[in-house]
Amino acid sequence: MAFYVRRNNFDAEDSVLLAVQDYLRWSSTPFRDREPAGCVFAVFESFKRDASIVFRDNVRWLVRCSYKYVDSSESLIRAMLRHDNYITEACAVIGLLAQVAEYWGYDNPIPISARVIELFMRLIADYEISHIRSVINIRLQCFAPRKSRNI
């Protein structure tokens, strides 16, 4: 079922939406049951740092509130976005939702991942998808294996 979990590259024909959905499903799976992830998911894991930058001290609170109050958490998340850096904020939303999936999905990952994916689809605008693609490709360069240099 996981299409992107072991991927180390992200090509022009790859779907950002499917990759993020796959990542959010993977995030809701208990750690002991997760498949080892490739570089694409390592990039998505780096989005959690963006969440801590954008949402600051509210990350834990938002994670705890998001399960029971999905609809109100959407409005809370929107209210905390300043819209001064759309790219970082889009990545932060993905990072935050991954933390929600991890926190709440442990015992029952399928309904949790479905709720988190639904929330993701409501929070991310279409124009942000291409920006997320750019971030994935740029950050993948950081995770690419270093070629040894012969001096």
Curated annotation (Swiss-Prot):
> What InterPro entries does the record tag this protein with?
Poxvirus_Bcl-2-like (IPR022819), Poxvirus_sf (IPR043018)
Q: Gene3D superfamilies per the record?
A: dsDNA poxvirus
Q: Where are the transmembrane segments?
A: none
In which family does this protein belong, per the annotation? Belongs to the poxviridae B14 protein family.
* Protein name as annotated: Protein B14 homolog
Q: What is the lineage of its organism?
A: Viruses, Varidnaviria, Bamfordvirae, Nucleocytoviricota, Pokkesviricetes
